[in-house]
Amino acid sequence: MNIDPSEKEKFNQIAEEWWDATGKFAPLHVINPLRSKYISDKVDLNGKNVIDVACGGGLLTESMHECGATVTGVDISDVAINTAKIHAEKNNYNVTYINGEAEELLNDSKETFDVVT
């Protein structure tokens, strides 16, 4: 997969703001409940194995975890993944975060997922 290094760097520079509901990611905080509800209306997440591709700081990832899913978040931004890990640890969430490309992860893994976001 081709990744634009400047795009990755842009998100690395602002990744620590993921959980600031009034910061640069404020629109995601507004729509996240809608995204989460849409997904949970389509599939019962309880007990499902979910992968959240391009998870960023983990907003949707954690929402799906709260619905009972076992969630793996993957993102190319190492800073965003670190931010997501720290936030999950603070909340005692058992979420797996992986820094990398989803395509490579899926090619290298024998794990399967019930839901892909």
What residue ranges belong to the model's regions?
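N-terminal, positively charged/glycine-rich alpha-helical extensions of SAM-dependent methyltransferases
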Residues: 1-19
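Alpha-helical elements of Rossmann-like donor-binding domains used by nucleotide-donor carbohydrate transfer enzymes
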Residues: 10, 34-38, 83
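Class I SAM-dependent methyltransferase Rossmann-like catalytic core
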Residues: 22-26
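Conserved alpha-helix/loop element of class I SAM-dependent methyltransferases that forms part
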Residues: 29-46
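Structured loop/turn residues at beta-strand edges in well-structured enzyme cores
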Residues: 48, 93, 111
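Conserved class I S-adenosyl-L-methionine
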Residues: 48-54
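Class I SAM-dependent methyltransferase SAM/SAH-binding core
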Residues: 51, 59-104
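A short acidic, Gly/Pro-enriched loop at the edge of an enzyme's catalytic core
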Residues: 107-116
